[in-house]
Every structure is written in structure tokens, then in C-alpha cells.
């Protein structure tokens, strides 16, 4: 993926404001609520029976933070996203058998969460840069499947 200086600035500038714990928890909770079939990958998380249960679930919160912390590695390594996520791609494909479409869904939700939290900063240009980034991350995570 080729990045312009403006795209890099829009991504890193916004990322510096992100509360990884809060935005990560919200993004994963939204994924599990909006796309309930994704819950099957999180059976060990306990009660996911309602939106309230998902939002209040400490394991969802903790894993959301872990997911978004990992996403931060893409921000730090914009020019080497594929290699950055090689091991995670292998884990999600070979061991967890996650449908790669879920990576795209989570990326779409992350954009919604960022837009909600940073509406002034989330200009159409920022959205375009972030859309490019979440596509690149989803593609890198799905790489082992191809």
C-alpha cells in the first residue's frame, strides 16, 4: 500500500487522540451486537445474550483493547502492514478459523467509532485515509487464507 504524506498525517494525527481501551471495547462490542454471528468466536467470553451484556462484559472490553492495540501496530508500520500482521493472520486462519469477512466488518465499525468520537477531526479526507488503512489491515489479516 502506498501512502501520501497527507494520509499518513491524517492517520497518525487522529491515532494520537484515540483511547485504545475505550474505542477498542466499543468497536468489538458493536461488532458482536450488530453482527451477532461473530459471537461464535467468543464463546469463552460468557454472557453475550444482549447488547447490555456485551457492553458490560469485561472480557469483551479487554479483548477490544487488545485488538485496537494490535491495530496501532499498523499505524506505526504503515509501510509494512502485511509483515506486521503475518503471525496474527496465521493465528486467525489456522487456529481460530475466523471468517476473513469479519476483519472487514470490524474495520467498518472502527471507522464508525472513530467518527463518533472525533467528529470534528474525522473529515472526509480522514475517513478516506482510515478506510484505506482498515482495508489494508483486513487484507493483511486475510492473507493466510489466500
Curated annotation (Swiss-Prot):
Ranges where the Globin domain occurs: 2-146
Binding locations of heme b: 63, 92
GO cellular component terms, semicolon-separated: blood microparticle; haptoglobin-hemoglobin complex; hemoglobin complex
InterPro entries hit by this protein: Globin (IPR000971), Globin-like_sf (IPR009050), Globin/Proto (IPR012292), Hemoglobin_b (IPR002337), Hemoglobin_oxygen_transport (IPR050056)
Domain of life: Eukaryota
PROSITE patterns on file: GLOBIN
Molecular function GO terms recorded: haptoglobin binding; heme binding; metal ion binding; organic acid binding; oxygen binding; oxygen carrier activity; peroxidase activity
Record note on quaternary structure: Heterotetramer of two alpha chains and two beta chains.
Function as written in the Swiss-Prot or TrEMBL entry: Involved in oxygen transport from the lung to the various peripheral tissues.
Record protein name field: Hemoglobin subunit beta
Species in which this protein is naturally found: Apus apus (Common swift)
